[in-house]
Regions:
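Conserved phosphate/oxyanion-binding catalytic-loop motifs
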Residues: 135
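Periplasmic peptidoglycan-binding/tethering modules of Gram-negative envelope proteins
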Residues: 1-132, 171, 193-196, 202, ...
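Periplasmic OmpA-like peptidoglycan-binding domain that tethers envelope proteins to the cell wall
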Residues: 138-239
Length: 239
């Protein structure tokens, strides 16, 4: 007797810091006519049976967060088969760190290794087409105020230029360099990763001076960052 063919899709919805989103909802359509939606479990996980050979598009959503999309092409394999797709959602209310953005030393030129992270941002903006964002570049407290402000502005504009060249409308983007004027506030995730920091600590120059040398360097690295902040969610919504 042949085993029953059961294909199962599993995964999680969580925010970019890695914490589950128990209020998440997933919308799912398939080329077999599937058109459904379902909520996730309290731990942000989900599990649903899928049909062998069917192609699916899934949209992960949660109130207060930007949408994320995944695609699945179920195989024709017989027996039990499992797939996993996770949805990582960016906050629509708080600044979001753009991981793995790198510039040439003391310049605004993006390195080639930044492309993957920026292309993910392009995909997110294409999917969330009614969103406008601020691109914010920050420096650490080393270097002069005017120099840091000029450098951070140029870096924010470099990111904006990249996105525009990839097809994102420039009027959806605002580039702002903050220099060293907006030090990073420690998040829960950061406090878990760096035990000498507490959630809510602000990495000011005065705070950093109280730390040992290695800890100071970590804080300077955390302050050197590029983030985006959602400004509007109604861009061309009523046109």
């Amino acid at each position: 007797m042949l085993p029953e063919t059961v294909h199962t899709l599993r995964g999680w919805i969580y925010e970019k810091d890695g914490y589950e989103l128990p209020d998440g909802v997933i919308y799912m359509i398939g080329n077999d006519g599937t058109n459904t939606s379902f909520g996730v479990m309290k731990d942000g996980s989900y599990s649903i049976r899928v049909t062998p050979g069917v192609e699916y598009v899934l949209l992960g959503t949660c109130k207060g967060y930007l949408n994320a999309m995944q695609e699945l092409k179920a195989t024709l394999d017989e027996g039990e088969h499992s797939y996993q797709l996770d949805f990582v959602l960016a906050s629509a209310a708080r600044p979001v760190l753009i991981d793995n953005i790198f510039y040439e030393y003391n310049k605004a030129t993006l390195t080639a290794s930044s492309a993957a992270a920026l292309d993910e941002l392009v995909t997110m903006l294409e999917l969330n087409s009614n969103v406008t964002i601020e691109l914010a570049a920050h420096c650490d407290s080393r270097g002069g105020d005017k120099y840091n402000l000029k450098l951070s502005q140029a870096r924010a504009e470099s990111v904006m230029k990249y996105l525009v060249e990839k097809g994102i409308e420039q009027e959806r983007l605002t580039a702002v360099g903050y220099g060293e004027g907006t030090p990073k506030t420690v998040t829960k995730k950061m406090s878990e990763q760096y035990k000498f920091l507490k959630e809510g600590d602000v990495l000011t120059e005065q705070f950093i001076k109280t730390l040992d040398k290695d800890e100071q360097e970590i804080c300077h690295q955390l302050n050197r960052r590029t983030e985006f902040q959602v400004l509007r969610t109604t861009y061309r919504l009523y046109e």
